[in-house]
Design a protein with these regions (language model features):
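Iron-sulfur-associated redox domains of electron-transfer enzymes in respiratory
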Residues: 1-182, 186-188
Length: 195
């Protein structure tokens, strides 16, 4: 009998940088493999599984930029205990969201030069379409964050992402503050946890 947690990793429109980041920790992935069964991960296997299948945990990367993406996202939500957005694209719309600060139709026409049949939906985070249980921010996420997140879920703990700024992490590590040397640093306003 297979008691492993069934996990799916579904990419929407995006660069798949977060999916690649998951592969950064091969030994930890092997360790997780004892407890989870990754049944949908395009970077592991050629055949994609259907979003109609039942999943315990689904990680979604990328932005829902097409009606196909939105349909898949809704199916995944319907068939999953947990839906977790990974990366800035899924969490906030990512780089694609920049088009929302201009005339999106003008940008569309410039990029696609009058090409017909290309959708031009508003860019929204996953949470605009479905309930998202947790988010792992970053562009891309780190493999370590992914591993920690899955591990916390496996032991029944509610996953948490650090809320401390990078400045806090530098102080804990005993590093000197570059601001004291007159150097520019975004540490005070940058969320920590990115190693």
């Amino acid at each position: 009998m297979n008691n492993k947690i069934k996990v799916g990793i579904f990419p929407l429109t995006g660069c798949e940088g977060c999916c690649v980041a998951i592969l950064d920790l091969p030994n930890k992935l092997l360790e997780l493999n004892e407890k989870i069964e990754i049944v949908n991960f395009r970077l592991f296997e050629e055949d994609e599984h259907s979003p109609d299948e039942k999943y315990d945990i689904v990680f979604v990367e990328g932005s829902p930029l097409t009606t196909r993406d939105i349909k898949q996202l809704k199916l995944v939500r319907k068939n999953s205990k947990y839906v977790i957005s990974i990366g800035s694209c899924a969490h906030m719309g990512g780089i694609y969201h920049l088009k929302m600060y201009q005339d999106k139709n003008k940008i569309h026409d410039y990029v696609y030069q009058g090409e017909k049949g290309i959708e031009n939906l508003d860019v929204k985070p996953l949470s605009a379409y479905v309930k998202v249980d947790f988010s792992i921010p970053g562009c891309p996420i780190t493999g370590e964050e992914f591993y920690d997140f899955v591990y916390q879920l496996l032991i029944g703990k509610e996953p948490a992402i650090t809320q401390n700024p990078v400045c806090y992490e530098c102080q804990v590590r005993g590093q000197k503050c570059v601001l004291q040397y007159g150097e520019v640093c975004m540490g005070p306003i940058t969320q920590g946890g990115c190693d």
